[in-house]
Regions:
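A beta-strand edge to alpha-helix "cap/lid" segment located at domain peripheries
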Residues: 2-4, 9, 19, 40-41, ...
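Regular secondary-structure segments
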Residues: 14-22
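Short, well-ordered alpha-helical segments enriched in acidic and aromatic residues
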Residues: 23-37
Length: 124
């Protein structure tokens, strides 16, 4: 088994994507994704497919004033990067947070698939 101490290209790309998310920078965020990327939940339900649907979905999210993702842990295995995050959001019920598992498949320098599993919402 090889232990890497340097960040991989996949890990750097996913961090760039997370930074763009926290900066609410749609262009920088989309630039991390292949134009045909599919975003799914862990049960296989398609959340968005391609840049147009992703832009539409994230544009709404980026209007939330308290939106912020905090990375708790990151694991990398080859082309897969898995993040455990806490997401602070403005839910319809009020301000709160939830844990999120985010799994990103990176090929040729872009995210080609993203899987998400949300935990329970805790309101403040």
């Amino acid at each position: 088994m090889t232990h890497l101490t340097q960040q991989t290209e996949a890990e750097l790309l996913v961090q760039k994507q997370l930074d763009a998310y926290n900066n609410k920078d749609i262009k920088a965020w989309l630039d991390c994704y292949h134009s045909d990327t599919v975003q799914l939940d862990f049960h296989g339900f398609v959340l968005a497919s391609g840049h147009d649907q992703m832009r539409q979905r994230i544009s709404v999210r980026f209007t939330e004033p308290d939106l912020k993702a905090t990375l708790l842990k990151r694991m990398v295995m080859g082309e897969w990067v898995i993040d455990h995050e806490v997401i602070q959001r403005n839910f319809p019920e009020g301000r709160g947070q939830m844990e999120m598992l985010c799994s990103y498949q990176v090929k040729q320098g872009l995210i080609v698939k993203a899987l998400f599993q949300a935990g329970e919402v805790v309101l403040f």
